[in-house]
């Protein structure tokens, strides 16, 4: 037991000595490396040679896309690699020290910034330590929350694909001093976003020349390509708009006597206005392009507005004053003949079979109307009225071709009726008979006027029904064409529906 304890104590002591020696080597190495080191000096063996810096990034997350302010917010880890000529050592002279770390400001590092930064601090990176190995290879990985300006093209919203550029480059060094080289971006640690799908992040190296200097100024641009996920906007904007536009078609199915046709149209129009305001709050105030969903809302509002106008015309037809005149001939031909035939509409009661008259040649013959002498019958005024018709057997009216009056009712013309009423010479028999016949003539004229007014009203009401049915078909077709034509015009409509709504 004593021997084993002694061996364990010796091993522990050896480990402590080794750690103390390694700490001594690190301290010595830091002192030697920073002895004559100047962080302002470009670390190259020959000042005429450029220092090559390899640059790339790791996209961790798309945090926000502000369409209104056109700002992209991302979580990115930058990666910069270069070789520092003054930070090299022999590993054998410093056992166990394979790499060292220098905080920001102690050694030289490239001043690479995001050119199109929209952050208030401009440089949004967290300055971490620089990792250096024995060969002088430096590795600098600063993370940061980057806010970059990005032109948001809302032409195909919400079926849009946005491309935002992240342009990086040295702020003070030109191409002759710092050779910036690009490496492929890393998306292995990317965290998916609920609103956007990352399509890719390709990079490109370009060189720019300015009038002040002959040397080139290299920069690296990574393009964040992302596709909007449309499920949210489809359920909250598109589908309600489609349903509201379908409700607008119900205006033509609502009876004119209900008194709610105009109210329904105005309500639908106000609902679409509310959705338009929601879209306007999301979209940037730009006149470069009109969003796809705004085009669809605008077309739907035009349809609803026209439906309200047509509804006013339909109500004017339905409640047309018969004293205002008969329907014009061209209106009757177009609406009651052509459109009614095309829509397979028939006037109410047109299919009913009218009873045939027993006397076609003598429709108004009064030969069968004979009032014999009535004895013992007292009138309401207390007097006995003896009425007799003589010589009326041969009186009849001219046949008429008017089919608007039901058979069985006297359809004589006013002249024929006048001759009929005076042919029996009622005044020679009894003056009360003349008064009665005058009242009968008034009642007949009144019925005739009512029939004519009713026929005119029915004609206008049928015309209103034809306009309603015609507009229902026309607006339905136009709504379907606008819905399919506008929404499917987006380049990635099929892809968005298959991925987001599947």
Swiss-Prot record:
Pfam families to which the protein is assigned, alphabetical: Neur_chan_LBD, Neur_chan_memb
Keyword Hydrolase: no
One annotated Gene Ontology cellular component of this protein: dendrite
Extracellular-side positions: 24-233
Biological processes per GO annotation: calcium ion transport; chemical synaptic transmission; cognition; intracellular calcium ion homeostasis; monoatomic ion transmembrane transport; negative regulation of cytokine production involved in inflammatory response; negative regulation of tumor necrosis factor production; positive regulation of angiogenesis
Subcellular location: Postsynaptic cell membrane; Cell membrane
Regulation: Activated by a myriad of ligands such as acetylcholine, cytisine, nicotine, choline and epibatidine. Activity is modulated by positive allosteric modulators (PAMs), such as flavonoids, with a wide range of chemical diversity, pharmacological sensitivity and efficacy. AChR activity is inhibited by the antagonists alpha-conotoxons RgIA, ImI and ImII, small disulfide-constrained peptides from cone snails.
Record keywords, A-Z: Calcium, Cell membrane, Disulfide bond, Glycoprotein, Ion channel, Ion transport, Ligand-gated ion channel, Membrane, Metal-binding, Postsynaptic cell membrane, Receptor, Signal, Synapse, Transmembrane, Transmembrane helix, Transport
Signal peptide: 1-23
Residues annotated as glycosylated: 46, 90, 133
Domain of life: Eukaryota
Residues that span the membrane, as ranges: 234-254, 262-282, 295-315, 470-490
PANTHER family referenced in this protein's UniProt entry, alphabetically: NEUROTRANSMITTER GATED ION CHANNEL
Assembly and binders: Homopentamer. Can also form heteropentamers with CHRNB2, mainly found in basal forebrain cholinergic neurons.
Family per record: Belongs to the ligand-gated ion channel (TC 1.A.9) family. Acetylcholine receptor (TC 1.A.9.1) subfamily. Alpha-7/CHRNA7 sub-subfamily.
Protein name: Neuronal acetylcholine receptor subunit alpha-7
Organism in which the protein naturally occurs: Gallus gallus
